């Protein structure tokens, strides 16, 4: 590989890393917006998750740069050999000096050993996770859904998961309501039926029921931020869509919201341990048996 080609590859790699860092910062901002500032427990977990995401990206970038560097010729060693040959005194038959290992090479070898140790720890953690809460929950939900000839349809964890899961279900029925539509209609319905929702909303700092101003902000956040949706929002959506919404969970019986409606229920999957931030909603789809039969 000549020097120009090497520089071009290195420049491309650095540009890629910059883009990935920008993308991660956008994701982090979305994560921050999805957790209320007064929810100290989830904010603390959020800080830990963000730190892990940034650390993982930093480690991967270092590994990629290290791999790139190892593909390049070692200029110190080449020059060392050349200098040794040109300094030979044939008359005195001086011994040829062996090229010394550069400091950069020593650092790379030390780094490689550290990364190998880290990879081994990650592998051990992955094995341990097979008995962890997240894996057990996923396995149990898969069995529950398989009995209905269904499987989980993964939904991004971005604060919109509940609305995205419902959007997916509606599209399967020919309904083109979007996440933005669902959020807007949910907020409008809750504001127009405040007496049905206010008693269930309390200030996490004082324990008091929301004031009218706090309730208005809550509804405004539904529309303007990726605020996480829960049972109150599901209740509103059930009335808006005039459809029952069934929530399947691993550790207890399904919850059905809007049982008064007779149309086919929308089915969601509630996962308590799916992500570091906690609760998450997925959608469902027909079970794909092709992999089992292949």
Curated annotation (Swiss-Prot):
It comes from the Eukaryota. Keywords: Hydrolase, Protease, Thiol protease, Ubl conjugation pathway. Residues 111-120 have a biased composition (Basic and acidic residues). The active site is at residues 158, 161, 280. Residues 155-161 are annotated as: Cys-loop. Residues 27-36, 73-86 have a biased composition (Polar residues). Residues 222-232 are annotated as: Variable-loop. GO terms for biological process: protein deubiquitination; proteolysis. Residues 1-46, 67-120 are annotated as: Disordered. Residues 150-287 form the OTU domain. CDD domains: OTU_OTUD6. It is an enzyme of class 3 (hydrolase). SUPFAM superfamilies: Cysteine proteinases (SSF54001). Its EC number is 3.4.19.12. GO terms for molecular function: cysteine-type deubiquitinase activity. It catalyses: Thiol-dependent hydrolysis of ester, thioester, amide, peptide and isopeptide bonds formed by the C-terminal Gly of ubiquitin (a 76-residue protein attached to proteins as an intracellular targeting signal). PANTHER family: DEUBIQUITINASE OTUD6B, OTU DOMAIN CONTAINING PROTEIN. Deubiquitinating enzyme that may play a role in the ubiquitin-dependent regulation of different cellular processes. This is Deubiquitinase OTUD6B.
């Amino acid at each position: 590989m000549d020097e120009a080609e090497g520089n071009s590859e290195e420049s491309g790699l650095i540009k890629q890393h910059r883009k990935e860092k920008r993308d991660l910062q956008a994701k982090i901002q979305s994560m921050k917006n999805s957790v209320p500032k007064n929810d100290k427990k989830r904010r603390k977990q959020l800080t830990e998750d963000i730190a892990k995401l940034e650390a993982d990206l930093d480690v991967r970038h270092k590994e990629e740069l290290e791999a790139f560097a190892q593909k390049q010729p070692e200029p110190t060693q080449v020059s060392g050999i050349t200098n040794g040959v040109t300094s030979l005194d044939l008359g005195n038959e001086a011994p040829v000096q062996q090229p010394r290992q550069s400091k950069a090479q020593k650092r790379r070898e030390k780094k490689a050993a550290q990364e190998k140790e880290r990879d081994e720890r990650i592998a051990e953690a992955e094995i341990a996770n097979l008995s962890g809460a997240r894996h057990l929950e996923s396995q149990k939900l898969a069995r529950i859904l398989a009995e209905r000839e269904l499987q989980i349809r993964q939904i991004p964890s971005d604060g919109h998961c509940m609305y995205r899961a419902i959007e997916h279900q509606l599209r399967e029925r020919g309904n083109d309501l979007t996440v933005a539509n669902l959020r807007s209609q949910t907020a409008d319905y809750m504001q127009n039926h405040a007496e049905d929702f206010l008693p269930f909303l309390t200030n996490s700092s004082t324990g008091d029921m929301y004031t009218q101003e706090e309730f208005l902000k809550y509804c405004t956040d539904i529309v303007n931020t990726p605020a996480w949706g829960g049972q109150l929002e599901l209740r509103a959506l059930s009335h808006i869509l005039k459809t029952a919404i069934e929530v399947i969970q691993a550790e207890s019986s399904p919850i059905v919201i809007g049982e008064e409606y007779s149309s086919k229920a929308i089915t969601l999957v509630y996962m308590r341990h799916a992500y570091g931030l906690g609760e998450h909603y997925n959608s469902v789809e027909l079970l794909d048996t092709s992999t089992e039969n292949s």
